[in-house]
Amino acid sequence: MRYSKEIVNQIKIIDEVLYSLNLPSILKNEYFVTDTISCENYLKLHNNKPNNIFFSIILNSFGVQIDIDEAKEILDLSLSSPKEEKYFKEFVKILFTSFIRIKKYGKYYIKISFFNQKRECVKTIRYIKINSFSLNFKATLKEYAPLYLSW
């Protein structure tokens, strides 16, 4: 499929991360599946590596979005500046190479922590569904190995 200029540029940013890890392009990568509703101006890719965290990368003419587990729009950027492009690239590298811990309090509060190879926390994201309060629920914890190891 042919994609718009914006989508192609977003793919290039992701591919830079993959190439730095000596891996193939995201479009040729065995661990990513293209969603059936993808078209010229919209591309949705799902991670399908067995026993790994589920996440989606959504590329469109307005920017990028990343959903992790049940948390939607964990990252939502327009990529309209070099600073946003750099942040996106760094986030993708963390997503691809980190151990990930998901701590859920009900279905309305999710804490996602990313750990490097030394098991040091490098990033934490909190997802709270609007108009909800669920800290009274017992927390569930899941941990996932990195999609790719970085050396």
Language model segments and positions:
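Negatively charged, low-complexity tracts enriched in Asp/Glu with abundant Ser/Thr
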Residues: 1-40, 121-151
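Amphipathic protein-protein interaction modules
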Residues: 78-129
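A cross-family detector of function-defining hotspots
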Residues: 33-45, 51, 108-122
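Short linear motifs in intrinsically disordered
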Residues: 31-36, 53-58, 99-105
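Generic hydrophobic, helix-prone segments enriched in Leu/Val/Ile
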Residues: 14, 57, 91-92
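Short, solvent-exposed secondary-structure boundary motifs
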Residues: 23, 42-50, 91-93
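Intrinsically disordered, low-complexity regulatory segments enriched in Ser/Thr/Pro
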Residues: 1, 44-86, 125-151
